[in-house]
Amino acid sequence: MKIDNMTKLAKFVKRPNRFQAYIELEGEEMMVHVPNTGRCREILLPNCTVVLREENNPNRKTKYDLIGAYKGEKFINIDSQIPNKVVYEALYNKKVESLAKYNIIMKEKTFKNSRFDFRLENDEGEVYFLEVKGVTLEDKGVARFPDAPTERGAKHLKELVEAKKSGYGAGVLFLMQMDNISEFRPHDEMDKMFGEALRYAAINGVDVMAYECSVDEKSITLTKSVKIVL
């Protein structure tokens, strides 16, 4: 998918809280919005090059969103609103082979008391619930999730198991918001409960998928599957 708004390069200064960061743009220090509540400590380092997306909204306090950063030569998109859009595009274009038979794609649909990112349906009326997780944490080609504890993430996985036991298809797709990934693993050192929930889901028939992206400052597209090590 293309990023239509104007983007600019800047220098990262600091991040006082989850939603705000200070950057230096054309010699001026200013506050920007960070559309990611994760820690991103391995990415947002002082003086690293970041990418800003201009937001033309007069009601906002900040003019820019910080949507990505360079970790050495690797560009990583950190916008938490991007993964669902990228996966929707991939589902529509039949890029996720195991889900290609589903022609109806509905966003943000409920199952009992749960809300999943996607509800898919094929011509035979078979229903599949899909949850998407964006991944920004990487070390030497190994991607991990989460980069901060997430009770909500573990809850989603257990709810997918309930959907599977009720006769529906169910899966979780981890989207690497970067390229050149050798494998994906749950980040047990950060959140053991999530790792246990992911393995529990897999044992109980929930599909676990991982895909990397072709990504640059103006676009991000799902490309190929990544090896999963649980």
Curated annotation (Swiss-Prot):
InterPro entries: SfsA (IPR005224), SfsA_C (IPR040452), SfsA_N (IPR041465)
Signal sequence interval, chain numbering: none
Xref: Gene3D superfamilies: 2.40.50.580, 3.40.1350.60
Pfam families, sorted: SfsA, SfsA_N
An example Gene Ontology molecular-function term: DNA binding
Paired cysteines (S-S): none
UniProt record similarity statement: Belongs to the SfsA family.
Protein's name in the database: Sugar fermentation stimulation protein homolog
Organism of this sequence: Clostridium acetobutylicum (strain ATCC 824 / DSM 792 / JCM 1419 / IAM 19013 / LMG 5710 / NBRC 13948 / NRRL B-527 / VKM B-1787 / 2291 / W)
